[in-house]
């Protein structure tokens, strides 16, 4: 019996390097530790230990050579480092739906190798690399890039296919009986969430200082809506950190975005499938129910590698249609102005918040020092709030107008959105003047376009270095734990009183009764949920206190003696009322 128990214990705790590698791979694809544990039949603690020490285990893999493995040659470290950067470039290209070919990848590999060799100087002087066909085939196998063509050149946007596709799509819509409310499109976009126009002093200072560059900190957003424009999907945000410091006190499921992560901050097939089954399906089903329309959906997506074809077979009610290759830049609705409009709103909202922060800063510092203080404290949480506000700001006319090329028969009233971006850019320039920043309209255009530009070699090297830095930060002990802020009853009472005092203050200083009264009601209604929590907690406290313990705290009247009984029974000639009993206020123990 003992031997059986020990063997079971061993099977639970003894892991092979292949198992550890599988855990790390699934984690980097965005799967949670609990999900990994369920899939592999392991405890979450075990998964956490491996994932948090991934660098250590990866070194083990490099040094481990199975007995039945024949060592052909030791791989060049410079080539291995180059390939890591090359993978980032390939993923960046495919995420932008830019077709690739063998020759393009070979040329890029050679360029990256020569740049890295020159940077390393004498220590890499003897290193050699030929981007041969044999190397390409081995690299493709190692990196699991099975969809890259081994021959031929990459194709440009297919104008002919784009011209004929709307007719084919119209037939699908007609046969399925889909309305504008039932047709959806989603698309990913790379997003630099903490980036200033290049000519501002903040951008110049960051460029001159070595080390981490906040302006190069990139995330991926998935944005989508229906053709009617009356239903925006909750943005999905993919970051490279599972638990950023700014989010430590927040339950991620309550954020205004669907927060996901992997080490490269990119969409994967696993993440997209999870989004499709866990969020999109139940959300659009609820929407159809509320609108009293049949639950049948047409979802249009591009041919990105992160969009698996298996989605077409999951739900009968959701018809997943892949647009023709190399047509998304011409046809895909989200790419026709929704994403660019959203990004312009994000920039304007960022500048608005900077101005508000400077106005509320009562320190004696200059305008530039106040702006630097604001920008230094601008976190991923602030970015998430900005994403929420900017996505809410995208108008119905923009959401519907971008479908004009794809389904012209369903989109009748079309209002342009380009003027909207131009107006927002003009607003940014005006706010920049108040912030003492050098910003011209072309600077705003350059920044908005930079999100979609292909990464330069310098940016690729920098992103690889920052990725390693974040991996080291994530692997430190204790990062897996998240501390949730406690909302105490005492704090609730304090802040509720502050709001009530503010409402009373406006009424006191404003001679316009209607205005102050309206504001007072709005303030009171806005915190109704917190009042409810507060009163419920007070009620619970009262119920916990027993009736007998309550009365024991009240002053006890003296027991009458026999001598005083007769006297007390005589009517009093005094009109003085007896002193009231002291009331004891119940207080919460430790909150």
Curated annotation (Swiss-Prot):
Key word Nucleus present: yes
DNA-binding region: 33-53, 103-142
Keyword DNA-binding: yes
Name this protein carries in UniProt: Tigger transposable element-derived protein 1
Gene: TIGD1
Region (Disordered) location: 550-591
A GO MF term: DNA binding
Cellular localisation: Nucleus
One Pfam assignment: DDE_1
């Amino acid at each position: 019996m003992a031997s059986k128990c020990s063997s079971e214990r061993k099977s639970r705790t003894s892991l092979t390097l292949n198992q550890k590698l599988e855990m790390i791979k699934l984690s980097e694809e965005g799967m949670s530790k609990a999900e990994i544990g369920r899939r592999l039949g392991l405890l979450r603690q075990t998964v956490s230990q491996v994932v948090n020490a991934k660098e250590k285990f990866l070194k083990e893999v490099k040094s481990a050579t199975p007995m039945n493995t024949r060592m052909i040659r030791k791989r060049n470290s410079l080539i291995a480092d180059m390939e890591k950067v090359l993978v980032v470039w390939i993923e960046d290209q495919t995420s932008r739906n830019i077709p690739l070919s063998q020759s393009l990848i070979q040329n890029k590999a050679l360029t990256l190798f020569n740049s890295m060799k020159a940077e390393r100087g004498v220590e890499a002087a003897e290193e050699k690399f030929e981007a041969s066909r044999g190397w390409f085939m081995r690299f493709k196998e190692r990196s699991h890039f099975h969809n890259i063509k081994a021959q031929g050149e990459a194709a440009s946007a297919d104008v002919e296919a784009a011209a004929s596709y709307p007719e084919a799509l119209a037939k699908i819509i007609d046969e399925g009986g889909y309305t504008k409310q039932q047709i959806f499109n989603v698309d990913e976009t790379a997003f630099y969430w903490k980036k200033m126009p290049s000519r501002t002093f903040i951008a110049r200072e960051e460029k001159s200082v070595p080390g981490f560059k906040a302006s190069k900190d990139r995330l991926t957003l998935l944005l989508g809506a229906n053709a009617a424009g009356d239903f925006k999907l909750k943005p999905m945000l993919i970051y490279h950190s599972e638990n950023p410091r700014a989010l430590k006190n927040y339950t991620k499921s309550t954020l205004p975005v669907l927060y996901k992560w992997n080490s490269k901050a990119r969409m994967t097939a696993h993440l997209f499938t999870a989004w499709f089954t866990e969020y999109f399906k139940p959300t659009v089903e609820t929407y159809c129910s509320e609108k009293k329309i049949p639950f049948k959906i047409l979802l249009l997506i591009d041919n990105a590698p992160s969009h698996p074809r298996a989605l077409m077979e999951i739900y009968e009610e959701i018809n997943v249609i892949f647009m023709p290759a190399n047509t998304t830049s011409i046809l895909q609705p989200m790419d026709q102005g929704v994403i660019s409009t959203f990004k312009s709103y994000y920039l304007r909202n960022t500048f608005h918040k900077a101005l508000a922060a400077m106005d509320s800063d009562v320190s004696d510092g200059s305008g530039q020092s106040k702006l630097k203080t604001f920008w230094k404290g601008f976190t991923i949480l602030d970015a998430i709030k900005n994403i929420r506000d900017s996505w809410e700001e995208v108008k119905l006319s923009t959401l519907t107008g971008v479908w004009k090329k794809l389904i012209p028969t369903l989109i009748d009233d079309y209002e342009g959105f380009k003027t909207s971006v131009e107006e927002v850019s003009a607003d940014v320039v005006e706010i920049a003047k108040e912030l003492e920043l050098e910003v011209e309209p072309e600077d705003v255009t350059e920044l908005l376009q930079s999100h979609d530009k292909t990464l330069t070699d310098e940016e690729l090297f920098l992103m690889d270095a920052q990725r390693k830095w974040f991996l080291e930060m994530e692997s430190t002990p204790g990062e897996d734990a998240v501390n949730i802020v406690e909302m105490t009853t005492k704090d609730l009472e304090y802040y509720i009183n502050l709001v009530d005092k503010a409402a009373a203050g406006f009424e006191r200083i404003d001679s316009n009764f209607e205005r102050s009264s309206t504001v007072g009601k709005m303030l009171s209604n806005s915190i109704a949920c917190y009042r409810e929590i507060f009163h419920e907690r007070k009620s619970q406290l009262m119920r916990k206190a027993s009736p007998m313990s309550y009365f024991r705290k009240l002053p006890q009247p003296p027991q009458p003696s026999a001598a005083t009984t007769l006297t007390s029974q005589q009517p009093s000639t005094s009109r003085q009322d007896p002193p009231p009993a002291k009331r004891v206020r119940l207080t919460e123990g430790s909150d």
